[in-house]
């Protein structure tokens, strides 16, 4: 069994490498963000020498949000990239309501311009209030959760993509698709 603390630390490093800085570790992602699993393991071993392929596969399998994907001998982050990637995710045509957690100080800008991806390619949305709340907590203590009308997004021509088990992504959330602010 993989220890939770070790798994958490390695998963954070994997997210950093795969989402933001593969080149810093000598990796060259393809257009979809995939790198060779063996190369990722070598990169991670420079920080955590005890890491094995089984350990990485266990992280991928047990990740509750489905952050990572292994396809053949390659691995990628499924969402959250700060560099351009082509994500060929399935469209979510069924969700009616989605959630976005943020800190209160961001509300003024959001209510003026909608939710923008900022330094990422997509806005991250959650299937549950709880997930959105905890995502918002990473940015501060005064969290608000925005209720997003998924049908409104679709009517406006936005595609909602299934990026992970409980995560959806969209290019932008216009103000008029924010249906409620939950404290």
From Swiss-Prot:
Keywords carried by this UniProt record: NAD, Transferase
Pfam family, one: PTS_2-RNA
Highest rank taxon of the organism: Archaea
Keyword Lyase part of the UniProt annotation: no
EC number(s) on file: 2.7.1.-
GO BP term, pick one: tRNA splicing, via endonucleolytic cleavage and ligation
Enzyme class: transferase
Keyword Transferase attributed: yes
GO MF annotations, alphabetized: NAD+ poly-ADP-ribosyltransferase activity; tRNA 2'-phosphotransferase activity
Function (record text): Removes the 2'-phosphate from RNA via an intermediate in which the phosphate is ADP-ribosylated by NAD followed by a presumed transesterification to release the RNA and generate ADP-ribose 1''-2''-cyclic phosphate (APPR>P). May function as an ADP-ribosylase.
Family: Belongs to the KptA/TPT1 family.
Name of this chain's protein: Probable RNA 2'-phosphotransferase
Organism listed in the record: Pyrococcus furiosus (strain ATCC 43587 / DSM 3638 / JCM 8422 / Vc1)
Origin organism lineage: Archaea, Methanobacteriati, Methanobacteriota, Thermococci, Thermococcales
Gene: kptA
